[in-house]
Amino acid sequence: MRFNPPLEEARLIRRYKRFLTDIETVTGELLTIHCPNTGSMLNCMVEGGQVWFSRSNDPKRKLPGTWEIAETPQGRLACVNTARANQLVEEALLAGVITELNGFTALKREVPYGQEKSRIDFRLDYPDGAAYVEVKSVTLGFDGSAVAAFPDAVTQRGAKHLRELAHLARQGVRAVQLYCVNLSGIDAVRPAVEIDAAYAAALREAKSAGVEVLAYGVRVTSEEICVDRRLDVLLD
């Protein structure tokens, strides 16, 4: 996925009210742009740090742009726009990059399902049945480690999705939790038990119930982002 028009570089001033970010462009322009991430963004918010944003020319938009990429304290690039994860995964599914899920005949988005009135990110239809795929965007990394972690904040919604997937798996339906790791320099992903122990427990329970747990890494640059490799998932 290439950024078109190209992203613009800026310096982060602050993020506030969850969805607002103040930046200074390389030309000295001060802007308030949209922050498309509801998480804590623990390692993605460095005041004065380098960021990249997409600018909108839509006169109906209240804000002139969207924060897309941040440079972390470890020098990695993180795609902080969580909406990109589903776009990247769909692109990878259609290109056959996620080999475990190849062979589907139809792809449907945001399909209602489950006991708790959820919507699955993707339902893939195969000749012998359907697979339900839940996508999570991962950007949390640590100094001196090539292992990313999810979540970066307590997520009751994420735990609910795991319960829904586990219920499907127990019924013999193929259920998949897919982590889209939008952070460069990563080899594996794990549950962030130190941040949300309940989510970590729900993930292990879902795996025991038969849910497939996959992780794929994204090559992140300021020009292009794309899913390019499978990563290990560490649950022990």
Swiss-Prot record:
Gene Ontology MF terms: DNA binding
Disulfide bond sites: none
A Pfam family matched in the record: SfsA_N
InterPro entries: SfsA (IPR005224), SfsA_C (IPR040452), SfsA_N (IPR041465)
Classification via NCBIfam families: sfsA
Similarity annotation: Belongs to the SfsA family.
Name of the protein in question: Sugar fermentation stimulation protein homolog
Organism name: Pseudomonas fluorescens (strain SBW25)
